[in-house]
């Protein structure tokens, strides 16, 4: 009975595979949204104010960062929790493939969240005259919470690796 339960639990890791496939569908949706933004931007780029253009570009950078986060979580999550990727010889292989454990994945996700939050904060500050001061304060506090959390996670991961 114990062996059956252990094998069933181990096999259940494959239930994560459709979730990672779903993330690739989400990446496709993000890509479509990105090019929709490009399509709307190009006809008006010469008549846009510089600040408005920068806001659109920051939005596009934000989408690129979220896309990178999706790829990182999708691939390293699959490798860490489901199965190793069997990439054919001669194909491009990402440098970090097979080297990122769940701890380093958490740190990369935290760093990505801080970067995404930074872009959002920059967009907010570019439009600060339209936003009440109390909301600006909340944006900064939330961003600082992400930053401090990333530092704490990094410190704890370093301490855990040092203890081993």
From Swiss-Prot:
Keywords for this protein: Cell membrane, Membrane, Transmembrane, Transmembrane helix
Any one Gene Ontology cellular component term annotated for this protein: plasma membrane
Location in or out of the cell: Cell membrane
UniProt xrefs under InterPro entries: UPF0114, UPF0114_bac
Positions of transmembrane segments: 15-35, 53-73, 103-125, 136-156
Main location: membrane
Keyword Cell wall biogenesis/degradation: no
Topology of the protein relative to the lipid bilayer: Multi-pass membrane protein
NCBIfam families linked to this entry: HI0507 (TIGR00645)
Family: Belongs to the UPF0114 family.
Protein name: UPF0114 protein Avin_40830
Source organism: Azotobacter vinelandii (strain DJ / ATCC BAA-1303)
